[in-house]
Amino acid sequence: MDEFHRYGKEDSSWQQCFLYPLFFQEDLYAISHDHYLDGSSSSEPMEHLSSNDQFSFLTVKRLIGQIRQQNHSIVLFVNCDPNPLVDRKKSSYSESVLEGLTLVLEVPFSIRSKYSVEGMNEWKSFRSIHSIFPFLEDKFPHSNYVSDTRIPYSIHPEILVRTFRRWIGDAPSLHPLRSILYEYRNSSESLQRSIIVVPKVNTRFFLFLWNNYVYECESILVSLLKRSSHSRSLSHGSFPQRTHFHRKIKNIFLFSRRNSFQSIWSLKDPNIHYVRYGERSIIAIKGTHLLVKKYRYYLPIFRQCYFHLWNEPYRVCFHQLSKNCSSSLGYFLRVRMKPLLVKTKMLDELFIADLITDEFDPIVPIVPIIGLLSREKFCDISGRPISKLSWTSLTDDDILDRFDRIWRNLFHYYSGSFGRDGLYRIKYILSLSCAKTLACKHKSTIRVVRKELGPELFKKSFSKERELDSPPFSSKAAARSQRERIWHSDIPQINPLAHSWQKIQDLKIENLFDQ
């Protein structure tokens, strides 16, 4: 790859004209075949990987010819043969072709990403998901509108091919990609016109498709802001398997009235901040209602013209930060801007100034959390705990672990809020719901369950809570801990309750625009 980068720096035309011959390099398929064996050796028996099944590069070349002729006798994504030995051999060659195609396409993409990030002084990029918390504390006080947008992940195969065609001039190299994408769409259970590009499929091919698709989605946003600003900023490069990044745009000035985008900017100095995690992105803007309204209708149209697909209007929805809940990492957080008085004093000239600024003050939204718990059958609509009947078939350890995981995620996330009194009500609902679930399973009473398993209920969460609520050393440290917020680094873990919450909110927004 380093050798390709050096050649690409000297002459960038080679990857647009000579990609297709790389498909017939035996070294490429030797590497891809080794990667496939390494990934499947832990889950498949070793006798299937014996030396009797020799890997033939001639067979690989014939498979490539079948793809060119769109011969659907080979299946790259669905294994239909009941014979495991024949199926294993077929899958080995098919996956090697798929790995080889991915390796070839990664060469120009990595070069394009590497040499397109010049002038990063105007753009500050942080590729860690934990940078979202400094983003919330630093940028939300300077914003008044926030948009929580879900990136469209259902797209037609031909549009994906056209995104590659914009920066790869070698048309024959895209024929195998087109055939593979159409075959994957036809082999899926739901025969739709679109395919789903999500990073949850843990294969090199789908990770590459997702990174390239996100790169294209965000490059149009970057180019729009570049045209609307005097300052020079370049688009970001999303490298493979680096899907979490944080990007900030600042100091956007009003462009010339002769610019075609002058109708977008009705404020001289709008602050625009952007962050993405997984399939969702947050855009924070400080501007007038007219500016936000224009963004609301302009961004879907701009993306529609770029990707040639209809983008639902509810995917871009701005709401006022001071009146609504803000979504982050699947959870919802109510934000209150608290005025903070800062006094400055200059001793020499005896000058005293009082500065008033906004401070990020997150609040735990108790009512939405109770509404979500009632939807998930942990309590009724008034917040009275009930038993989780769907979990009574599980073991006691599984029930305790599931309740413990939900409480730990909620407590760790909202521990960054100053007022955590509402969390104790949530803890009461979950603990009593857990006790009722165990009592319903064993056909006993809550008193018996608490007597037998009382210390074990949320044992890990209680210990973590005591570490936060009872700081060591001195009373001064205890007082300081009450003024400071603590964001835990294990918040981004998978939480089914948070995903369910996000789906409910997306459905509400969709129904709102359908009316």
Curated annotation (Swiss-Prot):
A GO biological process held by the record: tRNA processing
Compartments where located: Plastid, Chloroplast
Disulfide bonds: none
Any one of the GO CC terms: chloroplast
GO molecular function: RNA binding
Keyword Transmembrane attached: no
Keywords per UniProt: Chloroplast, mRNA processing, Plastid, RNA-binding, tRNA processing
Keyword Transmembrane helix in record: no
Family the entry assigns: Belongs to the intron maturase 2 family. MatK subfamily.
PANTHER family linked to this entry: MATURASE K
Role this protein plays: Usually encoded in the trnK tRNA gene intron. Probably assists in splicing its own and other chloroplast group II introns.
HAMAP family: MatK
Protein name from the UniProt record: Maturase K
Organism: Picea rubens
Gene field: matK
